[in-house]
Regions:
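Mixed-charge, Lys/Arg-rich low-complexity intrinsically disordered regions
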Residues: 2-35
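Short, solvent-exposed secondary-structure boundary/capping segments
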Residues: 65-78
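Short coil-to-beta transition motif at edge beta-strands of beta-rich domains
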Residues: 29-48
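Short beta-strand-centered aromatic/proline hotspots
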Residues: 50-65
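Intrinsically disordered, low-complexity, charged/polar segments
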Residues: 78-128
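Short, surface-exposed beta-edge/turn micro-motifs
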Residues: 35-38, 53-56, 71-72
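Hydrophobic beta-strand positions in blades of beta-propellers and related beta-sheet-rich domains
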Residues: 56, 74-76, 82
Length: 128
């Protein structure tokens, strides 16, 4: 597994990403996910220590293009790393609007440093 920040590792451990969940790299395009998906990535924001920190993100709208700048944008809510989460709570974050409005963010796709990753729930096994 790739090396993630301590905050990301703790988040993944809380939501059971090794058991019921899986982490996959997704393209930096409108097929990166749908509303309610949890993504995480490193984002270039200035220079110096901490300028490329990991962000955990609840997607509300896949990539859109800004008419003025031509930038591809990713919109949604920043998920606080220090919260307490379970696989079930991740599913309800989007539906129940549990994130504070001041956490709403728009990220420029070209400033995402490295791969864009999505946390996906594994489909249940079919028992015959």
């Amino acid at each position: 597994m790739a090396k993630f920040s301590k905050g990301i590792q703790n988040f993944l451990a809380q939501v059971g990403a090794n058991d019921d969940m899986r982490i996959s790299m997704v393209p930096k395009s409108d097929s990166c996910g749908g509303p309610g998906d949890i993504l995480f990535f490193r984002y270039k924001l200035g220079t110096g220590r901490g300028s490329r920190a990991f962000r955990i993100f609840l997607l509300t709208e896949p990539v859109t293009k800004d008419a003025k700048t031509g930038n591809q944008l990713l919109t949604g809510f920043k998920v606080p790393e220090d919260g307490t989460y379970t696989p079930e709570s991740l599913e309800s974050l989007y539906n129940n609007s549990e994130l504070p409005e001041d956490g709403y963010r728009t990220y420029i796709m070209s400033n995402i440093f490295g791969p864009l990753r999505k946390i996906s729930k594994n489909p249940p096994e079919v028992v015959e």
